[in-house]
């Protein structure tokens, strides 16, 4: 049974122009977010008529984004309206009386680091890709964000094996966390029983790894370009953990090494609404096409659109 048969969606949406030039939308089976976005879209068109809109316009945003229906009878698609919804409010001051570790570290951060931490906490709600250049202090920002959310539950830090003890020192020395609350996992059978648990990428996909059986509140991935291959075992293991986490922070100085498809797995784990299916993502942003040797997703297309989407929805980069 097809998706459209399972969910009956309206083919006609009535649009009324009010006296004060406001737009009111009437459509069955539309949630409030879709109505608000559609009203904002039509507000700019100022067309006083009844629109015949395809079913795709009432579907979830990921369906919209991947159907290549970016305009219909002069109406911009809902995805493009996100730029009017995002980054419009000023960041509020922090209320961190109950977070002494975070408050202490916050005062020691540089201005650009404070700005990055504030964006990820207040704007991205703890789910973002921190892609600052090398030397700008991504580790300090990552520790600060981990301290802010530490009371929500266990935190898992995944990094290359040579950075495990670097993260241990960062949490204890920079973050002021007691050493008994930080665990560097050296064996697959070792259970992540501490508040902060650190494991390497190589150990994560092993069958007997206890980390895969544990639920975490926050996931931090340092050098996240290690999960660029969506078919690799480490990436699949990471996706399994990310589904259960409320906060996800990816950190890398090179978010995409060569091709846009290498961004898919990170975008899918952080916020899958715009990167739910790899084939749709490849068709839109990687010039995906079928060849004699199979499906080719090594190209690139709609570069400006992808760059805008990353800056507005996923990434902090200075």
Segments from the language model and where they lie:
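Walker A/P-loop
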Residues: 125-145
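Conserved helix/coil segment N-terminal to the catalytic DExD/H
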Residues: 188-218, 229
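Walker B catalytic acidic pair
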Residues: 222-223
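Accessory DNA-engaging acidic/polar modules
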Residues: 1-104
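Conserved P-loop NTPase motor "coupling/switch" region that bridges the ATPase
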Residues: 151-154, 218, 235-318
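Conserved helix-turn-beta segment of the N-terminal RecA-like "Helicase ATP-binding" lobe
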Residues: 163-186, 270-274
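Conserved Walker A/P-loop ATP-binding site and its immediately adjacent core
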Residues: 139-141, 152-173, 257-262
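Conserved pre-motif I regulatory segment
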Residues: 90-131
């Amino acid at each position: 049974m097809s998706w459209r048969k399972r969910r009956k969606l309206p083919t006609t949406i009535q649009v009324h122009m009010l006296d004060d030039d406001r737009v009111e939308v009437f459509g069955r089976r539309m949630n409030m977010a879709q109505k608000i976005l559609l009203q904002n879209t039509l507000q700019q068109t100022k067309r006083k008529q009844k629109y015949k809109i395809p079913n795709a316009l009432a579907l979830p945003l990921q369906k919209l984004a991947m159907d290549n229906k970016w305009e219909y009878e002069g109406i911009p698609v809902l995805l493009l309206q996100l730029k009017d919804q995002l980054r419009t409010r000023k960041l509020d001051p922090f209320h961190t009386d109950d977070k002494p570790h975070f408050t202490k570290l916050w005062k020691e951060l540089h201005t650009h680091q404070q700005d990055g931490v504030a964006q990820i906490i207040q704007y991205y709600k703890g789910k973002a890709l921190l892609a600052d250049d090398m030397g700008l202090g991504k580790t300090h920002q990552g520790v600060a964000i981990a301290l802010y959310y530490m009371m929500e539950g266990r935190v898992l830090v995944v990094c290359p094996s040579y950075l495990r003890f670097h993260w241990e020192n960062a949490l204890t020395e920079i973050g002021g966390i007691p050493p008994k609350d930080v665990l560097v996992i050296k064996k697959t059978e070792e259970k992540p029983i501490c508040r902060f648990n650190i494991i390497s990428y190589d150990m994560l996909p092993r069958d007997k790894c206890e980390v895969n059986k544990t639920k975490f509140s926050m996931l931090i991935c340092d050098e996240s370009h290690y999960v660029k291959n969506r078919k690799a075992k480490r990436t699949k293991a990471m996706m399994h953990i990310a589904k259960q986490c409320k906060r996800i922070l990816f950190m890398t100085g090179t978010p995409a090494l060569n091709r846009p498809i290498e961004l898919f797995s990170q975008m899918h784990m952080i916020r899958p609404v715009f990167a739910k299916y790899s084939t749709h993502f490849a068709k839109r942003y990687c010039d995906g096409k079928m060849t004699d040797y199979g499906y080719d997703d090594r190209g690139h297309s709609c570069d400006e659109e992808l760059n805008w989407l990353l800056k507005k929805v996923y990434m902090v980069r200075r």
